[in-house]
Amino acid sequence: PKEVLISVGETLLEAVNKNNINKECILSIGLTNQRETIVFWNKKTLEPLSPAISWQCLRGIDFCNSIVGTKLEAMINKSTGLKVDPYFSFSKIVWALRNLKALFDKKDICVGTIDSWILANIVDGNPHITEITNASRTGLFNTKTETWDIEILDGLEIPISILPKVVKSNHNFGVLSVNILGKKIPINSILGDQQSSLY
């Protein structure tokens, strides 16, 4: 996960320097990311508690197979619009909570998609938030109510307390820490990679 943060900082600097952009002219920045990849970290220290578990990871396949044909599968389909598949974040979260010793006590842990992990580390105040295009690919987000689905969370034994707050994509996500570009810059938009490709 820390490699992702290094890459973000380097990319921002490269974009500014290669294009001779005056940092004082930057009014706002946005963020885009691959959506289903997750990271667990300690809320207080920001230390990662797991490697990034990629959208390509299939470790949740046995769990997914175990709930096919159950009420839980039907709830996930109806509430999220997604099928039960290890591609989506919920299976990775379930697998990690059951298999990674660092997560067993569930104290001070949080989890999020990559946008959430990046924000927690580059924004003043270290917020634990995500936005709808990322949340909607977890298999935990009710797309009708635009909230985490409590019934699904209960069925999967995922505490809502470890999940980020969900906000709109065009939200004031906070201010980029001054130590990254030498200037505090607001982050006012986040979109998943496929949605952002439209722009």
Where in this protein do the model-derived segments appear?
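Short beta-strand scaffold segments in enzyme catalytic cores
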Residues: 36-41, 139, 196-199
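Gly/Ser/Thr-rich active-site cleft segment
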Residues: 58, 76-194
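Generic structural signal for well-ordered alpha-helical scaffold segments
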Residues: 9-17, 97, 119, 199
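Short, charged, surface-exposed secondary-structure boundary motifs
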Residues: 62-66, 140-142, 199
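N-terminal glycine/serine-rich phosphate-binding loop of ATP-dependent small-molecule kinases
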Residues: 1-50, 78, 105, 154, ...
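Short, well-ordered alpha-helical scaffold segments within catalytic/effector domains
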Residues: 5, 9, 61, 192-196
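Hydrophobic or amphipathic alpha-helical targeting/insertion segments
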Residues: 45-48, 66-75
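Short alpha-helix plus adjacent loop in nuclease-associated cores
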Residues: 53-70
